[in-house]
Curated annotation (Swiss-Prot):
<keyword id="KW-0678">Repressor</keyword>
<dbReference type="InterPro" id="IPR032499">
    <property type="entry name" value="Phage_CI_C"/>
</dbReference>
<comment type="similarity">
    <text>Belongs to the CI repressor protein family.</text>
</comment>
<keyword id="KW-0238">DNA-binding</keyword>
<keyword id="KW-0804">Transcription</keyword>
<dbReference type="Pfam" id="PF07022">
    <property type="entry name" value="Phage_CI_repr"/>
</dbReference>
<comment type="function">
    <text>Repressor of lysogeny.</text>
</comment>
<protein>
    <recommendedName>
        <fullName>Repressor protein CI</fullName>
    </recommendedName>
</protein>
<dbReference type="GO" id="GO:0051259">
    <property type="term" value="P:protein complex oligomerization"/>
</dbReference>
<dbReference type="GO" id="GO:0045892">
    <property type="term" value="P:negative regulation of DNA-templated transcription"/>
</dbReference>
<dbReference type="Pfam" id="PF16452">
    <property type="entry name" value="Phage_CI_C"/>
</dbReference>
<keyword id="KW-0805">Transcription regulation</keyword>
<dbReference type="GO" id="GO:0003677">
    <property type="term" value="F:DNA binding"/>
</dbReference>
<dbReference type="InterPro" id="IPR010744">
    <property type="entry name" value="Phage_CI_N"/>
</dbReference>
<dbReference type="InterPro" id="IPR010982">
    <property type="entry name" value="Lambda_DNA-bd_dom_sf"/>
</dbReference>
Length: 192
C-alpha cells in the first residue's frame, strides 16, 4: 500500500497536532518547532504529510499517533492527558507586559500542593509557575505595580505594609498599593 494513497489530509494532521499541543494559533506551532511561519504555511499548502511533526508531537505529548495522522481513535491512549497532565495557561512576560502564550501540559505530580488556578509565566529564560488563588504571604509573587507587571519578592510588614524587592530599587508600600496576581510556587530553569 502506498502512503500517498491513504487519503490523509495534511491540513487535518497539522490541525490535530496543534490541538494535541494545546495551541490556539498556527504561529505557536511554528515557534515550537523553530521554523518560519512561511515554512509552516508551505506545509499547509503543499499537501505533503508532516510525519516528522506528528512523530515529535506523539513523543512530546503522549498523543496517539494514529489519531494524529487519521483522526481515528482517541487523542490520548489510556486517557494519559486527563489523568497525569494538568493544562496550565501560558504567558510571556517581557518589558513589564504579560502576553498570552501557548498552554503547557505539566504532570500533576510535579507540584507538592494541588495547583487549582495556575499559570505559567515565561520570562528571562525561566518558567515561573504561579498560583492565582494563593493568600498573601512572604515569597516570590507576580505583581501589577501601576500597570507594570513583574515578578517580585514580597515580605509582609506590620501595619498592613509590604517590602517589595527584586526590581532596580526595593521599596515599602501599603498592601493595597500594589496588586498581587499570584504567588510563584515553582521555577523551571534550563541549564546550558
Amino acid at each position: 500500500m502506498r502512503i500517498d494513497s491513504l487519503g490523509w489530509s495534511n491540513v487535518d494532521v497539522l490541525d490535530r497536532i496543534c490541538e494535541a499541543y494545546g495551541f490556539s494559533q498556527k504561529i505557536q506551532l511554528a515557534n515550537h518547532f523553530d521554523i518560519a511561519s512561511s515554512s509552516l504555511s508551505n506545509r499547509y499548502t503543499r499537501g505533503a504529510i508532516s510525519y516528522d511533526f506528528a512523530a515529535h508531537c506523539a513523543l512530546e505529548t503522549g498523543a496517539n499517533l494514529q489519531w494524529l495522522l487519521t483522526g481515528e481513535g482517541e487523542a490520548f491512549v489510556n486517557n494519559r492527558e486527563s489523568s497525569d497532565a494538568k493544562r496550565i495557561e501560558g504567558f510571556t512576560l517581557s518589558e513589564e507586559i504579560l502576553k498570552s502564550d501557548k498552554q503547557l501540559s505539566v504532570d500533576a505530580q510535579f507540584f507538592t500542593k494541588p495547583l487549582t488556578d495556575g499559570m505559567a509565566i515565561r520570562s528571562e529564560g525561566k518558567i515561573y509557575f504561579v498560583d492565582k488563588q494563593a493568600s498573601l504571604s512572604d515569597g516570590l509573587w507576580l505583581v501589577d505595580i501601576e500597570g507594570a507587571i513583574s515578578i517580585r519578592e514580597l515580605t509582609k510588614l506590620p501595619g498592613r505594609k509590604l517590602h517589595v524587592a527584586g526590581g532596580k530599587v526595593p521599596f515599602e508600600c501599603g498592601i493595597d498599593d500594589i496588586k498581587t496576581l499570584g504567588r510563584v510556587v515553582g521555577v523551571y530553569s534550563e541549564v546550558n
